[in-house]
Amino acid sequence: MEAESPASAGASEPRALGTVDSIGSQLSRIRRKLFTWDILKTIALGQMLSLCICGTAITSQYLAEKYRVNTPMLQSFINYCLLFLVYTLMLAFQSGSDNLLEILRRKWWKYTLLGLADVEANYLIVRAYQYTTLTSVQLLDCFGIPVLMALSWFILRARYKVIHFIAVFVCLLGVGTMVGADILAGREDNSGSDVLIGDILVLLGASLYAVSNVCEEYIVKKLSRQEFLGMVGLFGTIISGIQLLIVEYKDIARIQWDWKIALLFVAFALCMFCLYSFMPLVIKVTSATSVNLGILTADLYSLFFGLFLFEYKFSGLYILSFTVIMVGFILYCSTPTRTVEPPESSVPPVTSIGIDNLGLKLEESGLPETHSAVL
């Protein structure tokens, strides 16, 4: 075996150092792209929404398991009433085209359909638990994400890159890990009374959520957050109130009211109200799709709280699932999607995710935000 000459050894050393420097610069570039202040802020906002959803799940489960109270429509009705009292009345005192009566005159039927989609999405998902399994609900509820992306493509004219589809796949892989952890931990102990009906309810509910979220993104970016919440509060109160009298009046009559049950209802309503109030703000600076990816962690937060409140069994797969979902969420937020305008429009294309969307740029520059005249 021949010994390496000093000349060749000296030549290989700079090449090795160059390779190390190249790898280091690549890692540094990736780190700067993935861990910017704006992406970290987006992550924090998404997890704030997840905690709101976690609060609604914990209070609902506590009502169901400890007090045998199963009234999802009543709980939703209280939330819609709060939205009505705050945002609908706010619209009533607006002037011009933003006034409540003017909005109703021009677009009442559109907001009726939006309110119906939002109310029934909430109701169908909760009702599905009576028929199918926890695993089915967790997995099939993710069906709303591809539906949301498809609706965003055609309605909002969002254009995705390969990295976005990879990120969504990674997030769904994290959900699969969470479901596997549930099965191993023994939480999947309910076979369901009619799995097919339950699965159909989940798919319908997830699809209606997607419709509601796309409409929400359009309205908060083109019109205003107050208009969306005010109209959802108005029509949600009417629709859920009617449905409440039809499907839950017997369940409500059987409730043995005390201060603990009342406190749980108040806690649920506050969590739901915060979720509805903050979600448009987050969607405005990101997108409906990124928000839905971020709140996939809500079930995991509920599981972590359930370790103490409901004596769930812990599994290391929950930590792995949380990590995988967050990796997918960061990947999605790292690259902005592109929004194409109709051919006849002279408006330049804008991005619709992260810090690059038009709404946030207007906020940062201090310019007034333009409002579209149509929904």
UniProtKB/Swiss-Prot annotation:
Location of the protein in the cell: Membrane
Membrane topology: Multi-pass membrane protein
Source species, domain of life: Eukaryota
MF terms in GO: transmembrane transporter activity
Residues carrying N-acetylmethionine: 1
Keyword Zinc-finger: no
GO CC, one annotated term: membrane
Alphabetic keyword roster: Acetylation, Membrane, Phosphoprotein, Transmembrane, Transmembrane helix, Transport
Phosphoserine found at: 5, 22, 25, 28, 372
Transmembrane feature ranges: 39-59, 73-93, 108-126, 136-156, 165-185, 195-215, 227-247, 263-283, 290-310, 314-334
UniProt record similarity statement: Belongs to the SLC35F solute transporter family.
Family matches, as PANTHER family: DUF914-RELATED, SOLUTE CARRIER FAMILY 35 MEMBER F2
Function summary: Putative solute transporter.
Protein name, as recorded: Solute carrier family 35 member F2
Provenance organism: Mus musculus
Gene encoding the protein: Slc35f2
